[in-house]
């Protein structure tokens, strides 16, 4: 069932699917008071599956999520033009990837 929920602690507003007990499950989007936003898959109240997160500072991550963290493969684009495409583990670059900076310099390899 699709619902609108508001977190009393963070002030975030969620619009999307929940199970019978109100747990975020399936597709949904959540917006935080600072402007951060996540759209994608949820499981057990956590970002889990494919999704995209827009940070309040303009950075964007799109890719795989597990337990509310970037885990798997994804693209992180910094507001300043730098980006990283590759493997992630617990919100950190981990494994094989390509990082490109705003000045055009690049690194491809292991993190």
Where do the model's predicted regions map?
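Intrinsically disordered, low-complexity repeat tracts enriched in Gly/Pro/Ser/Thr and acidic residues
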Residues: 1-111
């Amino acid at each position: 069932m699709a619902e609108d929920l508001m977190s009393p602690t963070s002030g975030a507003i969620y619009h999307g699917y929940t199970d019978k007990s109100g747990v975020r499950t399936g597709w949904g989007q959540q917006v935080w008071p600072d402007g951060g936003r996540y759209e994608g898959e949820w499981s057990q109240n956590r970002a889990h599956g494919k999704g995209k997160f827009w940070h309040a500072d303009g950075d964007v991550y799109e890719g795989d999520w597990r337990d509310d963290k970037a885990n798997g493969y994804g693209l992180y684009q910094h507001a300043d033009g730098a980006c990283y495409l590759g493997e992630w583990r617990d919100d950190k670059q981990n494994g094989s990837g390509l990082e490109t900076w705003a000045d055009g310099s690049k690194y491809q390899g292991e993190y």
